[in-house]
Protein backbone atom coordinates (compact mmCIF):
# COMPACT_ATOMS: atom_id res chain seq x y z
CA UNK A 1 0.00 0.00 0.00
CA UNK A 2 1.04 3.61 -0.59
CA UNK A 3 -0.13 6.83 1.02
CA UNK A 4 -1.00 10.17 -0.55
CA UNK A 5 -1.28 13.34 1.53
CA UNK A 6 -3.38 16.11 0.03
CA UNK A 7 -4.73 19.53 0.87
CA UNK A 8 -8.50 19.17 1.26
CA UNK A 9 -9.50 22.71 0.14
CA UNK A 10 -7.27 22.34 -2.93
CA UNK A 11 -8.87 18.94 -3.67
CA UNK A 12 -12.39 20.41 -3.51
CA UNK A 13 -11.33 23.18 -5.88
CA UNK A 14 -10.03 20.60 -8.37
CA UNK A 15 -13.18 18.45 -8.10
CA UNK A 16 -15.39 21.42 -8.88
CA UNK A 17 -18.20 20.77 -6.38
CA UNK A 18 -18.44 21.34 -2.65
CA UNK A 19 -18.01 17.97 -0.94
CA UNK A 20 -17.73 17.43 2.78
CA UNK A 21 -14.64 15.63 4.01
CA UNK A 22 -16.84 12.86 5.41
CA UNK A 23 -18.39 12.33 1.98
CA UNK A 24 -14.99 12.21 0.30
CA UNK A 25 -13.78 9.69 2.87
CA UNK A 26 -16.90 7.56 2.35
CA UNK A 27 -16.53 7.48 -1.44
CA UNK A 28 -12.79 6.85 -1.23
CA UNK A 29 -13.47 3.87 1.03
CA UNK A 30 -16.02 2.47 -1.44
CA UNK A 31 -13.44 2.82 -4.20
CA UNK A 32 -10.76 0.99 -2.23
CA UNK A 33 -8.88 3.71 -0.31
CA UNK A 34 -8.89 4.24 3.44
CA UNK A 35 -8.29 7.44 5.39
CA UNK A 36 -5.07 7.07 7.35
CA UNK A 37 -4.69 10.47 9.00
CA UNK A 38 -6.23 13.97 9.23
CA UNK A 39 -4.18 16.97 10.38
CA UNK A 40 -6.08 20.22 9.83
CA UNK A 41 -6.52 20.65 6.06
CA UNK A 42 -4.06 17.83 5.35
CA UNK A 43 -5.69 14.43 4.71
CA UNK A 44 -3.74 11.22 4.11
CA UNK A 45 -5.32 8.37 2.16
CA UNK A 46 -3.97 4.86 1.75
CA UNK A 47 -4.19 3.58 -1.83
CA UNK A 48 -3.12 0.30 -3.40
CA UNK A 49 0.31 0.63 -5.00
CA UNK A 50 -1.00 -0.55 -8.38
CA UNK A 51 -3.10 2.63 -8.66
CA UNK A 52 -0.18 4.95 -9.33
CA UNK A 53 -2.60 7.37 -11.00
CA UNK A 54 -4.10 8.10 -7.55
CA UNK A 55 -0.85 9.18 -5.91
CA UNK A 56 -1.67 12.90 -6.19
CA UNK A 57 -4.43 15.40 -5.46
CA UNK A 58 -5.05 15.66 -9.19
CA UNK A 59 -5.44 11.90 -9.61
CA UNK A 60 -7.95 11.62 -6.78
CA UNK A 61 -9.81 14.71 -8.01
CA UNK A 62 -10.01 13.22 -11.52
CA UNK A 63 -11.44 9.98 -10.12
CA UNK A 64 -14.04 11.82 -8.02
CA UNK A 65 -15.01 14.09 -10.94
CA UNK A 66 -15.81 10.98 -12.96
CA UNK A 67 -17.56 9.27 -10.04
CA UNK A 68 -19.87 12.26 -9.56
CA UNK A 69 -20.43 12.53 -13.34
CA UNK A 70 -18.83 15.98 -13.54
CA UNK A 71 -16.54 14.69 -16.28
CA UNK A 72 -17.16 11.03 -17.10
CA UNK A 73 -14.75 8.91 -19.07
CA UNK A 74 -11.45 10.60 -19.87
CA UNK A 75 -10.05 12.99 -22.41
CA UNK A 76 -6.85 13.05 -24.41
CA UNK A 77 -4.91 16.30 -23.90
CA UNK A 78 -4.27 18.18 -27.11
CA UNK A 79 -0.65 17.61 -28.15
CA UNK A 80 1.43 20.11 -30.08
CA UNK A 81 4.98 19.52 -31.35
CA UNK A 82 7.58 21.29 -29.20
CA UNK A 83 10.48 21.21 -31.63
CA UNK A 84 12.67 19.56 -28.99
CA UNK A 85 14.65 16.38 -29.57
CA UNK A 86 15.91 13.98 -26.91
CA UNK A 87 18.81 12.13 -28.52
CA UNK A 88 19.81 8.79 -26.98
CA UNK A 89 23.47 7.78 -27.32
CA UNK A 90 24.13 4.08 -27.74
CA UNK A 91 26.47 3.80 -24.74
CA UNK A 92 23.56 4.20 -22.28
CA UNK A 93 22.05 0.85 -23.31
CA UNK A 94 23.91 -1.34 -20.75
CA UNK A 95 23.61 1.36 -18.07
CA UNK A 96 20.00 2.60 -18.09
CA UNK A 97 18.59 2.02 -21.56
CA UNK A 98 15.31 3.94 -21.78
CA UNK A 99 14.30 7.58 -21.66
CA UNK A 100 11.08 9.44 -22.37
CA UNK A 101 9.74 12.92 -21.79
CA UNK A 102 7.57 15.88 -22.73
CA UNK A 103 7.41 19.67 -22.64
CA UNK A 104 4.77 21.36 -20.46
CA UNK A 105 3.93 25.06 -20.87
CA UNK A 106 1.64 27.59 -19.19
CA UNK A 107 2.13 26.13 -15.73
CA UNK A 108 0.79 28.34 -12.94
CA UNK A 109 2.36 27.02 -9.77
CA UNK A 110 1.00 27.66 -6.30
CA UNK A 111 2.44 26.42 -3.04
CA UNK A 112 -0.04 23.54 -3.11
CA UNK A 113 0.39 22.58 -6.78
CA UNK A 114 4.20 22.53 -6.68
CA UNK A 115 4.06 20.53 -3.46
CA UNK A 116 1.63 18.09 -5.10
CA UNK A 117 3.93 17.64 -8.12
CA UNK A 118 6.99 16.90 -6.00
CA UNK A 119 4.94 14.59 -3.78
CA UNK A 120 3.71 12.69 -6.86
CA UNK A 121 7.26 12.44 -8.18
CA UNK A 122 8.54 10.79 -5.01
CA UNK A 123 5.52 8.50 -4.67
CA UNK A 124 6.02 7.27 -8.24
CA UNK A 125 9.68 6.61 -7.44
CA UNK A 126 8.78 4.55 -4.38
CA UNK A 127 6.04 2.46 -5.99
CA UNK A 128 5.85 2.15 -9.76
CA UNK A 129 9.51 3.08 -10.18
CA UNK A 130 10.73 0.50 -7.64
CA UNK A 131 12.79 3.02 -5.66
CA UNK A 132 14.04 4.66 -8.88
CA UNK A 133 15.51 1.41 -10.25
CA UNK A 134 12.75 0.71 -12.78
CA UNK A 135 11.89 4.34 -13.46
CA UNK A 136 12.61 7.85 -12.19
CA UNK A 137 11.16 11.29 -12.95
CA UNK A 138 13.11 14.50 -13.46
CA UNK A 139 11.35 17.90 -13.59
CA UNK A 140 13.23 20.93 -14.94
CA UNK A 141 12.68 24.63 -15.58
CA UNK A 142 12.63 24.71 -19.39
CA UNK A 143 13.73 28.36 -19.52
CA UNK A 144 17.09 27.34 -18.03
CA UNK A 145 17.77 24.69 -20.70
CA UNK A 146 19.90 25.84 -23.62
CA UNK A 147 19.18 24.66 -27.15
CA UNK A 148 16.52 22.32 -28.52
CA UNK A 149 18.66 19.19 -28.75
CA UNK A 150 18.95 17.33 -25.46
CA UNK A 151 21.32 14.37 -25.16
CA UNK A 152 21.02 11.27 -22.99
CA UNK A 153 24.54 9.92 -22.58
CA UNK A 154 26.73 7.71 -20.39
CA UNK A 155 30.13 8.92 -19.17
CA UNK A 156 32.81 7.95 -16.61
CA UNK A 157 32.00 9.08 -13.09
CA UNK A 158 34.88 11.57 -12.85
CA UNK A 159 34.58 13.08 -16.33
CA UNK A 160 32.01 15.84 -15.67
CA UNK A 161 31.11 18.22 -12.85
CA UNK A 162 27.92 20.06 -11.93
CA UNK A 163 26.20 21.67 -8.94
CA UNK A 164 23.43 19.31 -7.78
CA UNK A 165 20.23 20.32 -6.04
CA UNK A 166 20.50 20.86 -2.28
CA UNK A 167 24.17 21.82 -2.67
CA UNK A 168 26.36 24.77 -3.67
CA UNK A 169 29.41 22.61 -4.41
CA UNK A 170 30.70 21.71 -7.86
CA UNK A 171 30.82 17.89 -7.78
CA UNK A 172 31.71 15.00 -10.08
CA UNK A 173 29.21 12.18 -10.52
CA UNK A 174 31.38 9.99 -8.29
CA UNK A 175 31.40 12.74 -5.65
CA UNK A 176 27.60 12.86 -5.73
CA UNK A 177 27.33 9.11 -5.17
CA UNK A 178 29.86 9.22 -2.35
CA UNK A 179 28.83 12.36 -0.46
CA UNK A 180 25.47 13.81 -1.51
CA UNK A 181 22.47 12.54 0.55
CA UNK A 182 20.52 11.56 -2.58
CA UNK A 183 23.60 9.91 -4.04
CA UNK A 184 24.07 7.84 -0.90
CA UNK A 185 20.39 6.86 -0.88
CA UNK A 186 20.19 5.77 -4.52
CA UNK A 187 23.72 4.84 -5.63
CA UNK A 188 22.77 1.15 -5.40
CA UNK A 189 20.78 1.63 -8.63
CA UNK A 190 24.04 2.25 -10.51
CA UNK A 191 26.17 -0.22 -8.55
CA UNK A 192 28.42 -2.27 -10.81
CA UNK A 193 28.07 0.15 -13.76
CA UNK A 194 31.23 1.34 -15.50
CA UNK A 195 29.53 4.47 -16.87
CA UNK A 196 27.03 6.92 -15.40
CA UNK A 197 23.91 8.25 -17.20
CA UNK A 198 23.61 12.01 -17.69
CA UNK A 199 21.33 14.38 -19.61
CA UNK A 200 22.92 17.42 -21.24
CA UNK A 201 21.99 20.53 -23.22
CA UNK A 202 24.17 23.06 -25.06
CA UNK A 203 25.53 24.29 -21.73
CA UNK A 204 26.36 20.87 -20.29
CA UNK A 205 24.95 18.45 -17.75
CA UNK A 206 21.64 19.31 -16.06
CA UNK A 207 20.50 15.87 -14.84
CA UNK A 208 22.17 12.83 -13.29
CA UNK A 209 19.35 10.28 -13.47
CA UNK A 210 18.09 8.59 -11.42
CA UNK A 211 20.04 10.34 -8.64
CA UNK A 212 19.52 14.12 -8.75
CA UNK A 213 19.03 17.14 -11.02
CA UNK A 214 21.29 20.12 -11.50
CA UNK A 215 20.63 23.22 -9.42
CA UNK A 216 20.70 25.19 -12.69
CA UNK A 217 17.27 23.85 -13.80
CA UNK A 218 15.60 23.90 -10.38
CA UNK A 219 11.82 24.43 -10.48
CA UNK A 220 10.40 27.34 -8.43
CA UNK A 221 7.06 29.10 -8.03
CA UNK A 222 8.16 31.42 -10.86
CA UNK A 223 8.63 28.51 -13.30
CA UNK A 224 6.02 28.44 -16.10
CA UNK A 225 7.48 25.95 -18.60
CA UNK A 226 8.79 22.48 -17.77
CA UNK A 227 10.84 19.69 -19.25
CA UNK A 228 9.71 16.35 -17.84
CA UNK A 229 12.24 13.55 -18.40
CA UNK A 230 12.13 9.96 -17.21
CA UNK A 231 14.76 7.25 -17.42
CA UNK A 232 14.55 3.60 -16.48
CA UNK A 233 14.97 -0.07 -17.22
CA UNK A 234 11.54 -0.57 -18.80
CA UNK A 235 10.06 1.71 -21.47
CA UNK A 236 6.44 0.81 -20.72
CA UNK A 237 6.88 1.72 -17.06
CA UNK A 238 8.38 5.16 -17.68
CA UNK A 239 5.81 5.93 -20.40
CA UNK A 240 3.02 5.27 -17.90
CA UNK A 241 4.79 7.33 -15.23
CA UNK A 242 5.09 10.18 -17.72
CA UNK A 243 1.38 10.00 -18.56
CA UNK A 244 0.44 10.12 -14.88
CA UNK A 245 2.53 13.26 -14.33
CA UNK A 246 1.22 14.94 -17.51
CA UNK A 247 -2.43 14.24 -16.72
CA UNK A 248 -1.93 15.79 -13.29
CA UNK A 249 -0.50 18.97 -14.82
CA UNK A 250 -3.20 18.98 -17.51
CA UNK A 251 -5.94 19.01 -14.85
CA UNK A 252 -4.45 22.27 -13.55
CA UNK A 253 -4.63 23.88 -17.00
CA UNK A 254 -1.12 23.33 -18.38
CA UNK A 255 -0.46 22.66 -22.08
CA UNK A 256 1.35 19.49 -23.20
CA UNK A 257 3.88 19.47 -26.05
CA UNK A 258 5.46 16.39 -27.60
CA UNK A 259 9.15 15.70 -28.13
CA UNK A 260 10.99 13.30 -30.42
CA UNK A 261 13.03 10.67 -28.57
CA UNK A 262 15.73 9.68 -31.06
CA UNK A 263 17.23 6.24 -30.38
CA UNK A 264 20.09 4.90 -32.54
CA UNK A 265 17.68 2.63 -34.43
CA UNK A 266 14.30 4.39 -34.18
CA UNK A 267 12.54 7.61 -33.25
CA UNK A 268 9.64 7.63 -30.79
CA UNK A 269 7.14 10.46 -30.41
CA UNK A 270 6.34 11.07 -26.78
CA UNK A 271 4.12 11.23 -24.79
CA UNK A 272 2.20 8.16 -25.94
CA UNK A 273 -1.50 8.79 -25.27
CA UNK A 274 -2.69 5.86 -27.40
CA UNK A 275 -5.74 4.15 -25.93
CA UNK A 276 -6.00 0.39 -25.34
CA UNK A 277 -9.27 -1.43 -26.00
CA UNK A 278 -10.53 -4.37 -23.94
CA UNK A 279 -13.50 -6.43 -25.11
CA UNK A 280 -15.78 -7.54 -22.30
CA UNK A 281 -18.92 -9.68 -22.34
CA UNK A 282 -22.00 -8.73 -20.32
CA UNK A 283 -22.40 -12.35 -19.21
CA UNK A 284 -18.80 -12.41 -17.98
CA UNK A 285 -19.34 -9.31 -15.83
CA UNK A 286 -22.49 -10.76 -14.30
CA UNK A 287 -20.92 -14.17 -13.66
CA UNK A 288 -17.94 -12.67 -11.85
CA UNK A 289 -19.96 -10.19 -9.77
CA UNK A 290 -23.12 -12.26 -9.31
CA UNK A 291 -25.30 -9.46 -10.70
CA UNK A 292 -27.81 -9.02 -13.50
CA UNK A 293 -26.55 -5.88 -15.22
CA UNK A 294 -27.35 -4.86 -18.78
CA UNK A 295 -24.85 -3.43 -21.26
CA UNK A 296 -26.13 0.16 -20.66
CA UNK A 297 -25.82 -0.40 -16.89
CA UNK A 298 -22.20 -1.51 -17.26
CA UNK A 299 -21.43 1.38 -19.63
CA UNK A 300 -22.72 3.93 -17.12
CA UNK A 301 -20.75 2.35 -14.27
CA UNK A 302 -17.52 2.23 -16.29
CA UNK A 303 -17.84 5.88 -17.31
CA UNK A 304 -18.16 6.79 -13.62
CA UNK A 305 -14.84 4.98 -13.09
CA UNK A 306 -13.08 7.02 -15.78
CA UNK A 307 -13.35 4.61 -18.72
CA UNK A 308 -14.85 5.23 -22.14
CA UNK A 309 -17.00 2.69 -23.93
CA UNK A 310 -16.28 2.77 -27.67
CA UNK A 311 -19.01 0.34 -28.69
CA UNK A 312 -21.89 -1.42 -26.99
CA UNK A 313 -23.94 -4.38 -28.14
CA UNK A 314 -26.63 -6.25 -26.28
CA UNK A 315 -24.10 -8.76 -24.97
CA UNK A 316 -20.69 -7.04 -25.15
CA UNK A 317 -18.80 -3.78 -24.71
CA UNK A 318 -15.54 -2.45 -26.13
CA UNK A 319 -13.90 -0.54 -23.29
CA UNK A 320 -11.26 2.16 -23.80
CA UNK A 321 -8.62 2.23 -21.05
CA UNK A 322 -7.20 5.64 -20.02
CA UNK A 323 -3.51 6.18 -20.91
CA UNK A 324 -2.66 6.52 -17.20
CA UNK A 325 -4.28 3.26 -15.99
CA UNK A 326 -1.26 0.94 -15.94
CA UNK A 327 -3.07 -1.40 -13.56
CA UNK A 328 -5.60 -2.58 -16.17
CA UNK A 329 -4.03 -5.76 -17.56
CA UNK A 330 -7.05 -8.04 -18.08
CA UNK A 331 -10.80 -7.77 -18.48
CA UNK A 332 -11.19 -8.97 -14.89
CA UNK A 333 -9.55 -5.70 -13.81
CA UNK A 334 -12.31 -3.87 -15.68
CA UNK A 335 -14.93 -6.00 -13.93
CA UNK A 336 -13.40 -5.04 -10.59
CA UNK A 337 -14.00 -1.38 -11.38
CA UNK A 338 -17.59 -2.17 -12.39
CA UNK A 339 -18.01 -3.74 -8.96
CA UNK A 340 -16.51 -0.70 -7.22
CA UNK A 341 -18.80 1.68 -9.09
CA UNK A 342 -21.84 -0.50 -8.31
CA UNK A 343 -20.69 -0.74 -4.70
CA UNK A 344 -19.55 -4.04 -3.24
CA UNK A 345 -21.59 -3.20 -0.15
CA UNK A 346 -24.68 -3.19 -2.38
CA UNK A 347 -24.14 -6.80 -3.47
CA UNK A 348 -26.30 -9.16 -1.42
CA UNK A 349 -24.20 -12.03 -0.01
CA UNK A 350 -25.47 -15.54 -0.76
CA UNK A 351 -24.34 -19.04 0.12
CA UNK A 352 -23.00 -21.24 -2.70
CA UNK A 353 -25.44 -23.84 -4.01
CA UNK A 354 -23.05 -26.70 -3.25
CA UNK A 355 -21.82 -26.87 0.36
CA UNK A 356 -18.24 -28.01 0.86
CA UNK A 357 -15.47 -28.02 3.43
CA UNK A 358 -12.20 -26.36 2.49
CA UNK A 359 -8.82 -27.70 3.51
CA UNK A 360 -5.18 -27.46 2.49
CA UNK A 361 -3.97 -29.78 -0.26
CA UNK A 362 -1.17 -32.21 0.51
CA UNK A 363 1.13 -30.24 -1.80
CA UNK A 364 0.42 -27.05 0.15
CA UNK A 365 1.09 -28.82 3.46
CA UNK A 366 4.39 -30.14 2.10
CA UNK A 367 5.40 -26.70 0.86
CA UNK A 368 4.62 -25.15 4.25
CA UNK A 369 6.66 -27.84 6.02
CA UNK A 370 9.62 -27.18 3.71
CA UNK A 371 9.36 -23.44 4.38
CA UNK A 372 9.39 -24.01 8.13
CA UNK A 373 12.45 -26.25 7.78
CA UNK A 374 14.37 -23.76 5.64
CA UNK A 375 13.55 -20.92 8.04
CA UNK A 376 14.85 -23.12 10.86
CA UNK A 377 18.08 -23.52 8.88
CA UNK A 378 18.59 -19.76 8.99
CA UNK A 379 17.31 -18.87 5.52
CA UNK A 380 14.85 -16.12 4.68
CA UNK A 381 11.68 -16.95 2.74
CA UNK A 382 10.99 -15.03 -0.48
CA UNK A 383 7.96 -14.86 -2.75
CA UNK A 384 8.68 -13.98 -6.37
CA UNK A 385 6.59 -13.63 -9.52
CA UNK A 386 6.13 -16.78 -11.59
CA UNK A 387 6.65 -14.56 -14.66
CA UNK A 388 10.23 -13.54 -15.40
CA UNK A 389 12.38 -12.25 -18.24
CA UNK A 390 13.91 -14.64 -20.75
CA UNK A 391 17.27 -12.92 -20.32
CA UNK A 392 17.17 -13.60 -16.56
CA UNK A 393 16.51 -17.32 -17.07
CA UNK A 394 18.89 -17.92 -19.97
CA UNK A 395 21.24 -15.01 -20.74
CA UNK A 396 22.26 -14.07 -17.21
CA UNK A 397 22.43 -17.73 -16.13
CA UNK A 398 24.79 -18.56 -19.04
CA UNK A 399 22.25 -21.04 -20.47
CA UNK A 400 21.17 -21.62 -24.08
CA UNK A 401 17.49 -21.04 -24.83
CA UNK A 402 16.25 -24.62 -25.24
CA UNK A 403 12.79 -23.57 -26.44
CA UNK A 404 10.95 -25.19 -23.52
CA UNK A 405 9.93 -21.97 -21.75
CA UNK A 406 6.30 -20.88 -21.88
CA UNK A 407 6.38 -17.47 -23.58
CA UNK A 408 3.80 -14.74 -22.97
CA UNK A 409 2.36 -13.50 -26.26
CA UNK A 410 1.61 -9.97 -25.03
CA UNK A 411 3.84 -9.39 -21.97
CA UNK A 412 3.35 -6.52 -19.55
CA UNK A 413 7.09 -5.85 -19.82
CA UNK A 414 10.22 -7.61 -21.03
CA UNK A 415 10.99 -8.56 -17.42
CA UNK A 416 7.87 -10.75 -17.45
CA UNK A 417 7.85 -12.35 -20.91
CA UNK A 418 8.10 -16.06 -19.92
CA UNK A 419 7.01 -18.39 -17.15
CA UNK A 420 10.06 -19.29 -15.10
CA UNK A 421 11.65 -22.70 -15.67
CA UNK A 422 13.79 -22.48 -12.53
CA UNK A 423 13.64 -20.74 -9.15
CA UNK A 424 17.33 -19.82 -8.97
CA UNK A 425 17.02 -16.84 -11.38
CA UNK A 426 14.22 -15.45 -9.19
CA UNK A 427 16.51 -15.66 -6.17
CA UNK A 428 19.31 -14.02 -8.15
CA UNK A 429 17.00 -11.07 -8.86
CA UNK A 430 16.49 -10.69 -5.11
CA UNK A 431 20.24 -10.81 -4.47
CA UNK A 432 21.03 -8.32 -7.25
CA UNK A 433 18.42 -5.92 -5.86
CA UNK A 434 20.02 -6.06 -2.40
CA UNK A 435 23.68 -5.43 -3.15
CA UNK A 436 23.63 -2.55 -0.66
CA UNK A 437 22.38 -4.77 2.19
CA UNK A 438 24.49 -6.58 4.77
CA UNK A 439 25.79 -10.12 4.23
CA UNK A 440 25.28 -13.03 4.56
CA UNK A 441 22.14 -13.14 2.43
CA UNK A 442 20.76 -16.67 2.68
CA UNK A 443 17.38 -16.92 0.97
CA UNK A 444 15.05 -19.57 -0.42
CA UNK A 445 11.77 -19.97 -2.23
CA UNK A 446 9.17 -22.70 -2.56
CA UNK A 447 7.31 -22.10 -5.80
CA UNK A 448 6.12 -23.30 -9.17
CA UNK A 449 8.13 -23.61 -12.38
CA UNK A 450 6.81 -24.67 -15.77
CA UNK A 451 7.95 -25.86 -19.17
CA UNK A 452 6.37 -26.96 -22.42
CA UNK A 453 5.43 -30.65 -22.48
CA UNK A 454 3.33 -32.13 -25.28
CA UNK A 455 2.45 -35.11 -23.07
CA UNK A 456 0.37 -32.87 -20.80
CA UNK A 457 -3.26 -32.08 -21.65
CA UNK A 458 -2.52 -28.36 -21.44
CA UNK A 459 0.81 -28.64 -23.24
CA UNK A 460 2.54 -27.31 -20.13
CA UNK A 461 3.94 -29.16 -17.13
CA UNK A 462 3.98 -27.35 -13.79
CA UNK A 463 6.26 -28.57 -10.99
CA UNK A 464 6.73 -27.28 -7.45
CA UNK A 465 10.39 -26.69 -6.56
CA UNK A 466 12.42 -25.50 -3.60
CA UNK A 467 15.59 -23.49 -4.19
CA UNK A 468 18.11 -21.92 -1.86
CA UNK A 469 21.01 -19.51 -2.42
CA UNK A 470 23.78 -18.64 0.04
CA UNK A 471 25.55 -15.35 -0.65
CA UNK A 472 28.52 -14.31 1.51
CA UNK A 473 32.31 -14.39 1.42
CA UNK A 474 32.71 -18.08 2.34
CA UNK A 475 29.64 -19.50 0.56
CA UNK A 476 30.66 -22.72 -1.19
CA UNK A 477 29.65 -26.23 -2.15
CA UNK A 478 30.05 -27.67 1.34
CA UNK A 479 27.94 -24.92 2.92
CA UNK A 480 25.04 -25.33 0.50
CA UNK A 481 25.25 -29.14 0.71
CA UNK A 482 24.79 -28.93 4.49
CA UNK A 483 21.52 -27.05 3.92
CA UNK A 484 20.38 -29.67 1.40
CA UNK A 485 21.29 -32.57 3.69
CA UNK A 486 19.50 -30.97 6.64
CA UNK A 487 16.38 -30.42 4.55
CA UNK A 488 16.37 -34.02 3.32
CA UNK A 489 17.06 -35.35 6.83
CA UNK A 490 14.03 -33.52 8.18
CA UNK A 491 11.85 -35.42 5.69
CA UNK A 492 13.52 -38.80 6.19
CA UNK A 493 15.31 -38.73 2.83
CA UNK A 494 18.94 -38.33 3.92
CA UNK A 495 19.80 -42.00 3.31
CA UNK A 496 18.41 -41.76 -0.24
CA UNK A 497 20.15 -38.46 -1.03
CA UNK A 498 23.04 -38.59 -3.50
CA UNK A 499 25.04 -35.79 -5.10
CA UNK A 500 26.59 -36.99 -8.36
CA UNK A 501 29.26 -34.86 -10.07
CA UNK A 502 27.86 -33.06 -13.12
CA UNK A 503 28.56 -30.22 -15.54
CA UNK A 504 26.18 -27.27 -15.86
CA UNK A 505 26.81 -23.92 -17.64
CA UNK A 506 25.58 -21.90 -14.64
CA UNK A 507 27.98 -23.52 -12.17
CA UNK A 508 31.76 -23.73 -11.70
CA UNK A 509 33.18 -26.93 -13.28
CA UNK A 510 34.08 -29.43 -10.57
CA UNK A 511 31.80 -27.72 -8.04
CA UNK A 512 28.46 -28.85 -9.37
CA UNK A 513 26.41 -32.00 -8.86
CA UNK A 514 23.06 -33.54 -9.68
CA UNK A 515 20.73 -34.01 -6.73
CA UNK A 516 19.32 -37.54 -6.68
CA UNK A 517 16.80 -39.15 -4.37
CA UNK A 518 17.33 -42.84 -4.88
CA UNK A 519 18.11 -43.23 -8.56
CA UNK A 520 15.97 -40.31 -9.73
CA UNK A 521 17.49 -36.95 -10.64
CA UNK A 522 15.45 -34.28 -8.85
CA UNK A 523 17.66 -31.20 -8.86
CA UNK A 524 21.01 -29.44 -9.07
CA UNK A 525 23.53 -28.08 -6.54
CA UNK A 526 26.78 -26.14 -6.78
CA UNK A 527 28.66 -22.85 -6.82
CA UNK A 528 27.54 -20.34 -9.44
CA UNK A 529 30.21 -19.41 -11.96
CA UNK A 530 31.93 -15.99 -12.06
CA UNK A 531 30.35 -15.39 -15.48
CA UNK A 532 26.89 -15.70 -13.95
CA UNK A 533 27.77 -13.58 -10.93
CA UNK A 534 29.18 -10.83 -13.15
CA UNK A 535 26.05 -10.76 -15.30
CA UNK A 536 24.00 -10.11 -12.15
CA UNK A 537 26.48 -7.55 -10.79
CA UNK A 538 27.11 -9.70 -7.69
CA UNK A 539 30.62 -9.62 -6.23
CA UNK A 540 30.11 -12.17 -3.42
CA UNK A 541 30.26 -15.95 -4.03
CA UNK A 542 26.87 -17.63 -4.41
CA UNK A 543 26.13 -21.32 -3.81
CA UNK A 544 22.72 -22.75 -4.66
CA UNK A 545 20.56 -25.82 -4.87
CA UNK A 546 17.19 -26.45 -6.45
CA UNK A 547 15.04 -29.59 -6.38
CA UNK A 548 11.50 -30.89 -6.84
CA UNK A 549 9.59 -30.86 -3.57
CA UNK A 550 7.67 -34.03 -4.52
CA UNK A 551 10.92 -35.94 -3.91
CA UNK A 552 10.59 -35.13 -0.20
CA UNK A 553 7.20 -36.82 0.23
Curated annotation (Swiss-Prot):
It holds the Pfam family B3_4. The keyword Aminoacyl-tRNA synthetase applies. Its cofactor is Mg(2+). Its EC number is 6.1.1.20. InterPro entries: aa-tRNA-synth_II/BPL/LPL, B3/B4_tRNA-bd, DNA-bd_dom_put_sf, Phe-tRNA-ligase_IIc_bsu, Phe-tRNA-synth_IIc_bsu_arc_euk, Phe-tRNA_synthase-like_B3/B4, Phe_tRNA_ligase_beta2_arc, PheRS_beta_core. Coiled coil: none annotated. It catalyses: tRNA(Phe) + L-phenylalanine + ATP = L-phenylalanyl-tRNA(Phe) + AMP + diphosphate + H(+). Its main location: cytoplasm. It is found in: Cytoplasm. GO terms for molecular function: ATP binding; magnesium ion binding; phenylalanine-tRNA ligase activity; RNA binding. Residues 273-349 form the B5 domain. SMART domains: B3_4, B5. The keyword Transport does not apply. Keywords: Aminoacyl-tRNA synthetase, ATP-binding, Cytoplasm, Ligase, Magnesium, Metal-binding, Nucleotide-binding, Protein biosynthesis. Mg(2+) binds at residues 327, 333, 336-337. GO terms for biological process: phenylalanyl-tRNA aminoacylation. One of its GO terms (cellular component) is phenylalanine-tRNA ligase complex. Tetramer of two alpha and two beta subunits. HAMAP family: Phe_tRNA_synth_beta2. Belongs to the phenylalanyl-tRNA synthetase beta subunit family. Type 2 subfamily. This is Phenylalanine--tRNA ligase beta subunit. It comes from Methanocella arvoryzae (strain DSM 22066 / NBRC 105507 / MRE50).
